[in-house]
From Swiss-Prot:
Alphabetical keyword list: Amino-acid biosynthesis, Metal-binding, Methionine biosynthesis, NAD, NADP, Oxidoreductase, Sodium, Threonine biosynthesis
UniProt-listed InterPro entries: ACT_dom, Asp/hSer_DH_NAD-bd, HDH, HDH_cat, HDH_CS, NAD(P)-bd_dom_sf
Annotated residues for binding of NADP(+): V13, R44, K106, G188, E191, G303
ACT domain segment(s): 351-425
Protein name: Homoserine dehydrogenase
NCBIfam families associated with the record: PRK06349.1
Pathway of action: Amino-acid biosynthesis; L-methionine biosynthesis via de novo pathway; L-homoserine from L-aspartate: step 3/3; Amino-acid biosynthesis; L-threonine biosynthesis; L-threonine from L-aspartate: step 3/5
Annotated gene: hom
Length: 428
């Protein structure tokens, strides 16, 4: 008996999947009592087919999706093309043809996931996407299964390997933003246009998917607050270390009584926090829940083999569900109405770096500005000025989002003060 699959896209992960199937052939056969066979591979043009054959791949390469749709033996289609189009159009056609889908396309799922999941349910087929979040970490299935009896209250993750690589270089080797980005591009971690990585967009897509599994609520990327790495200076990293923190780009979801709040932002993590030691291109997700307490899931966030492993796990799960007659069930069965938290209910400590005139009385003026919004200080550091301008660094006590925005507005109105940076600070 065989399970016939088709692959759309034959890039890094697409070429890694056949190798993984071959390496695990005996184990897969024992688990499924069937052999997984790659029946067709969709390629973009004849030149790509020639290149693949020259590399030793001898699959049935095709140039149109229709050739896959017309093959009644193919039950699972694996989309590994990336980007929203033509992936969305292709997946829609595959689902309507009654075939199951596995994808690693986080962009597509974050933007059009609700629509595609509804379509899959209507046509009684599977739509699985474990590899879309944190590559080789089986976090989605863990949330869907192992946390089904628990209430998650807080999720915090390092979800983008490129930005984490850059922050590691900035923290451990005192590199600048530009130096760390150039190295990430040289190593192939960052694209020539790094916007999605450095501005928190990629992480926000993953956070949108995680919100469904962890909290049962669907968030669009537009409902997730985003800030990235571009404004981070060496002095910010140095001050974080001086105060006992590590600066990381994190994705966070908090649930409070009024709803959930999701944010991607540079964050001061206490050096004792489990995520503070997650370095390089690695990813991790830290979860606080009522039953289990604190738990963390760590692993490769990308790469050929880790991502292909998650893709293959989805294929195995689909075959099992076909055998037990539950193939139409959603990947994530936890859903409730989305409720966004009241900004007054979202509280954190914050780091502020403010440039002021280097003259008597300016620190007092700055203190008065903050206290006018009922914001008090946990730590204050006035850096040595040049006789003209100085920098004051503040870590506040807990404040809510409304107070944070008010402080930003007041600093913008003050011609003598310039807000250089502000970052969330975690820890008691």
């Amino acid at each position: 008996m065989t399970v016939n699959i088709a692959i759309l896209g034959f890039g890094t992960v697409g070429t890694g999947l056949p190798t993984l199937i071959s390496e695990n052939k005996e184990k897969l056969s024992k688990i499924l009592d069937e052999e997984i066979v790659i029946s067709k591979v969709l390629m973009r043009d004849e030149k790509a087919i020639e290149k693949a054959r020259a590399q030793g791949y001898q699959y049935d390469f095709v140039l149109t999706l229709e050739e896959i749709l017309a093959d009644s033996e193919i039950s699972i289609v694996v989309e590994l093309m990336g980007r929203i189009e033509p992936a969305k159009t292709y997946i829609t056609k595959v689902i309507k043809a009654g075939k199951n889908v596995v994808t690693a396309n986080k962009d597509l799922l974050a933007v059009h996931g609700t629509e595609l999941r509804a379509l899959a349910e209507k046509h009684h087929v599977a739509l699985y996407y474990e590899a879309a979040v944190a590559g080789g970490i089986p976090i989605l299935r863990t949330l869907a299964n192992s946390f089904s009896s628990d209430k998650i209250t807080h999720l915090l993750g390092i979800l983008n390997g490129t930005s984490n690589f850059m922050m590691t270089k900035m923290s451990e080797e005192a590199w600048t933003y530009d130096q760390s980005l150039a190295k990430a591009q040289e190593l192939g971690y960052a694209e020539s246009d790094p916007t999605n990585d450095v501005d928190g967009i990629d992480a926000s897509y993953k956070l949108a998917i995680l919100s469904e599994f962890a909290f049962g609520m669907t968030l669009s990327p537009d409902q997730i607050s985003k800030s990235g790495l571009r404004t981070i200076q060496k002095t910010d990293v140095e001050i974080a270390q001086q105060f006992g923190y590590v600066l990381k780009l994190t994705g966070e979801i908090n649930e409070v009584e009024s709803g959930i709040f999701a944010e991607v932002s540079p964050t001061f993590l206490p050096k004792s926090h489990p995520l503070a030691s997650v370095n390089g291109v690695m990813n991790a997700v830290f979860i606080e829940s009522d039953g289990i307490g604190d738990s963390m899931f760590y692993g490769a966030g990308a790469g050929q083999k880790p991502t292909a492993t998650s893709v293959l796990a989805d294929i195995v799960r689909i075959v099992k569900r076909e055998k037990d007659g539950t193939i139409g069930k959603s990947f994530n069965e936890y859903a409730r109405p989305t409720s966004l938290a009241n900004p007054h209910d979202i509280v954190n400590k914050y780091y502020f770096s403010v440039e002021t005139p280097d003259s008597t009385g300016q620190l007092l003026r700055l203190v008065e500005l903050f206290t006018s919004e009922d914001v008090s200080f946990e730590q204050v550091l006035q850096q040595k000025g040049d006789g003209h301008r100085a920098v004051v660094v503040i870590i506040s006590h807990q404040i809510n989002r409304v107070q944070l925005l008010a402080i930003q507005d007041k600093l913008k109105e003050e011609v003598d003060f310039k807000l250089l940076n502000y970052f969330k600070v975690l820890g008691d």
